[in-house]
Amino acid sequence: MFSKLTNIVLFIVLLLFCDVPLKAEQLKVTGKPHIIDGDTIKINSINYRFSGIDAPEIKQTCKKNEEVIYCGIIAKDKLVKKIGSNIPLCVQESIDRYNRIIAECFVKNKSLSKYLVR
């Protein structure tokens, strides 16, 4: 009926389709967060850096109308307020050159990255 090559190809295709849901499940995490700074949260002892944004570092200052403001603390505080008591869902997108997990994180189906850059 089927040639050996056809059976091998069918087997490989089947493996590929079976593997997709497992990988997608492994890339999602949810849990009580610890906010590190404006673009990084820790869930279950793992840091997740938000994709698509670069918030000020926690000790970073900025100037607004010649006044020094603590923009790193402001960014973190905005994130703390937005998350509140909600449990975020983070979907891993990649790992950067510094070996950090890059993820899109959501609260109530709203992107935290988009919220922070609005």
Describe each region flagged by the PLM.
Residues 2-118:
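Small beta-barrel nucleic-acid-binding modules, primarily SNase/OB-fold domains
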